[in-house]
């Protein structure tokens, strides 16, 4: 079942990184550390079990429901995030963003960061991540079928051509340098930074397309947690703290 255009996390990043324990049902997402048993995660080295239903997908290219997005919010950082306390969109993986006068072009300045495999996160990482959602001939689409969430980018210039197979890239997304991502829209949309907060629009490293099957089961992200083993359908998903995370460090390991 596809999610809404402006999906927000059931359990926020701040709560998870801070170590709040939550429960749902069936499988669980476990952040494991040196201490045994369930814990609130208030001190480093604790363990948190977060119970969720089995996700449809944990690769950004097709993350679409609450369960998948809960995993995604821990493994990946999109450009922006919704700050519930401020009631506004704020930068996350970007340092800043700005729009032109008619809200048809947005420029994002990318923070210096690393993927879990040590690769640099650049503007091209976002372009690659977005294009594999839309391109039905991408390696991941060839292996697992077209993305069901590419519509998040439907307002971007060049979307229809890439989706139809008449182009090889998303023409509305350009990378003047490694720290700058420019997005041109087909028509004005002032709330595009809100769209850019969706975890499906996270950056991906080159291995997302060069080693599709491995990435699908153990995605390599830029978020505060990284996979600890691969995802097995119907089983627990283990993650651990990413020590080289650019933002606030997790309080659980």
Set out the residue ranges of the language-model regions.
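N-terminal secretory signal peptides
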Residues: 1-11, 20-28
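Sec-exported extracytoplasmic/periplasmic mature domains
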Residues: 84, 131-139, 190, 197, ...
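Gly/Pro-rich hinge or "lid" segments in bacterial periplasmic/extracellular proteins
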Residues: 185-252
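Aromatic- and charge-enriched surface segment that lines or borders ligand/interaction sites
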Residues: 95-146, 182
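Surface-exposed binding/hinge segments that line
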Residues: 127, 141-205
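Short, well-ordered beta-strand elements
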Residues: 44-54, 105-108, 181-182, 223-225, ...
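Bacterial lipoprotein signal-peptidase II cleavage site
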Residues: 33-41
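N-terminal lobe/hinge region of extracytoplasmic solute-binding protein
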Residues: 51-101, 220
């Amino acid at each position: 079942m596809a999610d809404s255009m402006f999906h927000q996390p059931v359990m926020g990043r701040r709560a998870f990184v801070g170590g709040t324990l939550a429960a749902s049902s069936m499988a669980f997402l476990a952040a494991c550390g040196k201490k045994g048993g369930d814990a609130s995660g208030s001190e480093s080295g604790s363990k948190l079990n977060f119970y969720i239903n089995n996700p449809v997908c944990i690769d950004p290219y097709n993350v679409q429901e609450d369960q998948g997005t809960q995993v995604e919010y821990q493994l990946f950082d999109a450009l922006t995030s919704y700050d519930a306390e401020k009631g506004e969109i704020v930068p996350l993986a970007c340092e800043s963003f700005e729009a032109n006068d008619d809200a048809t072009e947005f420029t994002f300045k990318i923070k210096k960061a690393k993927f879990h495999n040590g690769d640099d996160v650049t503007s091209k990482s976002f372009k690659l991540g977005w294009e594999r959602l839309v391109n039905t001939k991408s390696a991941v689409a060839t292996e697992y079928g077209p993305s069901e969430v590419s519509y998040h980018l439907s307002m971007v210039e060049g979307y229809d051509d890439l989706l139809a197979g008449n182009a090889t890239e998303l023409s509305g997304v350009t990378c003047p340098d490694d720290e700058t991502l420019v997005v041109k829209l087909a028509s004005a949309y002032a709330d595009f930074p809100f769209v850019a907060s969706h975890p499906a629009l996270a950056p991906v490293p080159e291995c997302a397309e060069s080693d599709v099957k491995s990435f699908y089961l153990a995605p390599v992200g830029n978020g505060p947690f990284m996979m600890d083993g691969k995802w097995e359908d119907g089983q627990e998903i283990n993650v651990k703290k990413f020590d080289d995370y650019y933002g606030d460090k997790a309080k659980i390991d």
